[in-house]
From Swiss-Prot:
The gene is queA. Gene3D superfamilies: QueA-like (3.40.1780.10). The keyword S-adenosyl-L-methionine applies. It is found in: Cytoplasm. It catalyses: 7-aminomethyl-7-carbaguanosine(34) in tRNA + S-adenosyl-L-methionine = epoxyqueuosine(34) in tRNA + adenine + L-methionine + 2 H(+). PANTHER family: S-ADENOSYLMETHIONINE:TRNA RIBOSYLTRANSFERASE-ISOMERASE. This is S-adenosylmethionine:tRNA ribosyltransferase-isomerase. The lineage of its organism: Bacteria, Pseudomonadati, Pseudomonadota, Betaproteobacteria, Burkholderiales. Pfam families: Queuosine_synth (PF02547).
Length: 347
């Protein structure tokens, strides 16, 4: 019987200088590491993806839009406070991470962005329930900052507002970008459509939990963070059409994987159906993929749940080999880094 995998099995050494601090000069200007169905590695450029896709393949994009979720301000006592909105629950309500020297209690008012006050209504686990004096999205658009990942060291600027957002983003609610989609520009999307590659959309609002480390060696003990997703009927129909024509379902990003596989889990052994709700799906090696045939993704943090997800698709050893190759060849890692195209191993 094989030894169960532990957190240590998903560690690797990454020189800090390989963590991309800014995007490529142009969308689509990144490198692409291709792990094919025979587990062979190919060094390519992102535009080469067009030649790896076939007519009737279906690209499934996550159309979530990153909101300007970060706010700074003061408590009534004058102490500094930093707020990161995690989820908008009503037009004037949100659950948020609040960082302060002392946690605020119910009834406390937070003066934010020197512009308005939010009231603390209570707490749900690590998140605070806040009431805002106007629609949350309007206030964030006017006063918030783009919430960059913790490994990006500069403060968000106008370039980040534009480039830490996919060109097809339309459903506001994410606090982190679905980064595999950042490589696509409009000409690339038009080229793929012209060659018969289909597209469909899911929505998964990426939460700050995507950056949280796994803190237990026994993976079965890890509690996965929740994210809200929807797989619409139009996407279910597009998947059925693609399969009927022999096309592959190609997830653009791990968030698209989580949405599609969560819908498949809802359907159990029945046909895929439209679905929405919170998902805590934790994909690790041994998981049987039901909805996804190939994956476009960026490179993921050591010991992260996303590294486990890609290892479940391609195999632990092929991913270890791919990451060692990427480090040796000086690929750029994480959100603003290079991409990887993974085809499911041949049976």
């Amino acid at each position: 019987m094989p030894t169960p995998l532990t957190l240590a099995d998903f560690d690797y050494h990454l020189p800090p200088e390989l963590i991309a601090q800014s995007p490529a000069a142009e969308r689509g200007g990144s490198r692409l590491l291709h792990l094919d169905a025979a587990s062979r590695l190919h060094d390519r450029r992102f535009p080469d993806l067009a030649g790896l896709l076939r007519p009737h393949d279906l690209l499934v994009f996550n159309d979530t839009r990153v909101i300007k979720a970060r706010l700074t301000g003061q408590k009534a006592t004058g102490g500094k406070v930093e707020v990161l909105v995690e989820r908008i629950t009503a037009p004037d309500r949100a659950l948020a991470h609040v960082r302060a020297s002392k946690s605020p209690g119910p009834g406390m008012r937070l003066r934010l962005a020197e512009a308005f006050e939010a009231e603390v209504l209570g707490r749900e686990g690590e998140l605070f329930d806040l009431r805002f004096p106007a629609p949350v999205l309007d206030l964030l658009d006017a006063h918030g900052a783009t919430p960059l990942p913790p490994y990006i060291t500069h403060a968000a600027d106008a370039t980040d507002e534009r480039r830490y957002q996919t060109v097809y983003a339309r459903e506001p609610g994410a606090v982190a970008a679905p980064t595999a989609g950042l490589h696509f520009d409009q000409p690339m999307l038009e080229q793929l459509a012209a060659q018969g590659v289909q597209r469909a959309f899911v929505t998964l609002h990426v939460g700050a939990g995507t950056f949280q480390p796994v803190r237990v060696q026994n993976l079965a003990e890890h509690i996965m963070h929740a994210e809200w997703y929807t797989v619409p009927e139009a996407t279910v129909a597009a998947i059925a059409r693609a399969r009927a024509h022999g096309g592959r379902i190609v997830a653009v990003g791990t968030t698209s994987v989580r949405a599609l596989e969560s819908a498949a889990a809802q359907a159990q052994d029945g046909p895929l159906a439209a679905a929405q709700g919170d998902t805590r799906l934790f994909i690790t090696p041994g998981y049987r993929y039901r909805a996804v045939d190939a994956l476009l993704t960026n490179f993921h943090l050591p010991q992260s749940t996303l590294l486990m997800l890609v290892s479940a698709l391609a195999g632990v050893e092929p991913i270890r080999r791919a990451y060692a190759h990427a480090v040796a060849e000086r690929y750029r890692f994480f959100s603003y880094g290079d991409a990887m195209f993974i085809e499911t191993p041949a049976p």
